[in-house]
Amino acid sequence: MGRLMGLDVGSRTVGVAVSDMLGWTAQGVEIVQINEDEQEFGLDRIAELVKENEVVGFVLGLPKNMNNTSGPRVEAAKAYGELLEEKFNLPIDFIDERLTTVEAERMLVEQADASRKKRKKVIDKLAASLILQNYLDAKGKLLKELN
């Protein structure tokens, strides 16, 4: 198949995770620095990671509100998806990512006993991994299309 890349898109960072070749597990890769205000989206680094990891599709988290409405961050994630689609011409899917960052922080506190400073360095990468793992577990449509 190839790997899927999961992305947790923020205004200053993008957490990146990739699946294994079978589409069973997700692993955090890194956090790419971006700056929405300056129109710097880290696409050169994403391109390197796409090539290194033989990525065949993207999964982006949509940070919906708890009442299932969409706010500005959902629109920003969709816009980032459009940038990826234009640059890479690879399929893209979205998954509801409500509470993945909260879950990631809880995991880091409870299981890793990580300090606040350490958590800040890895939380977006872990959130991207959770987004992608949830997608893989739900057998998202890209898995069906690419197999």
Swiss-Prot record:
- The EC number on file is 3.1.-.-
One of the GO BP terms on file: rRNA 5'-end processing
NCBIfam families associated with the record: RNAse_H_YqgF
Family the UniProt entry places it in? Belongs to the YqgF nuclease family.
Q: Carries keyword Hydrolase? A: yes
Class of the enzyme per the UniProt entry, highest EC level: hydrolase
Q: Name one GO molecular function term.
A: nuclease activity
Q: Top-down, what is the taxonomic lineage of the species of origin?
A: Bacteria, Bacillati, Bacillota, Bacilli, Lactobacillales
Q: Which Pfam families match?
A: RuvX
Where does the protein end up? Cytoplasm
Put simply, this protein is called Putative pre-16S rRNA nuclease
Q: Give GO cellular component annotations, separated by semicolons.
A: cytosol
Keywords of the record, alphabetical order, are: Cytoplasm, Hydrolase, Nuclease, Ribosome biogenesis
| InterPro entries per UniProt | RNaseH-like_sf, YqgF, YqgF/RNaseH-like_dom, YqgF/RNaseH-like_dom_sf
Tell me the function of this protein: Could be a nuclease involved in processing of the 5'-end of pre-16S rRNA.
